[in-house]
UniProtKB/Swiss-Prot annotation:
It is found in: Nucleus; Chromosome. One of its GO terms (biological process) is intracellular glucose homeostasis. Chromatin-associated protein involved in DNA repair by promoting homologous recombination (HR). Binds double-stranded DNA (dsDNA) and secondary DNA structures, such as D-loop structures, but with less affinity than RAD51AP1. This is Nuclear ubiquitous casein and cyclin-dependent kinase substrate 1. The modification Phosphoserine is found at residues 14, 19, 54, 58, 61, 73, 75, 79, 113, 130, 132, 144, 181, 204, 214, 223, 229, 234, 240. Residues 91-100 have a biased composition (Low complexity).
Amino acid sequence: MSRPVRNRKVVDYSQFQESDDADEDYGRDSGPPAKKIRSSPREAKNKRRSGKNSQEDSEDSEEKDVKTKKDDSHSAEDSEDEKDDHKSVRQQRQAASKAASKQREMLLEDVGSEEEPEEDDEAPFQEKDSGSDEDFLMEDDDDSDYGSSKKKNKKMVKKSKPERKEKKMPKPRLKATVTPSPVKGKGKVGRPTASKTSKEKTPSPKEEDEEAESPPEKKTSASPPLEKSGDEGSEDEAASGED
């Protein structure tokens, strides 16, 4: 089959009679068409996030402002409470000090009222007892003498104590010298001769001098005197008969 033939129209550009200036004006008037910039999905997400963040930031800032306002109000209230507490403490202290001072004054007044009648009672008692001032002074002197007499008595007692101690000390006793008496042996004894008796009677001059120089000593006989035996008695009788 044969293709159908298309109608072709011949265009005469001369009919338009356009000049080059028209092309220039056309170029000036109509610029290139502006292309729309497609935004990428990342940028869109970032924008959304930034928007959310901005909203959150604004909310946080608002919350912070509210908190700061609350804190300021609390601090103001706390300061006022502290001031009130200080005032109340001061008032309590002042009230306590005033009460203590009042109690002291009351006690002093009570003590003064008690002492006044006692003084009034003591005054007539002193007037009755005490005579003149001279007697009162004499009584004081007596008191001073009494104190001095006490001191003297104490001194005398102290002096008498060592004397008692001296009395208690025992005195040294003299040693008793005992001369044992010669005991003659028993047996037959004859008559003593005259020479023996003369020797016994006449002491030697040396013995006399010694007795004169030496003082007589106290002789305490511890043992009782010995009884003369029969032989000694016979000897004495014989000596007396010879004389």
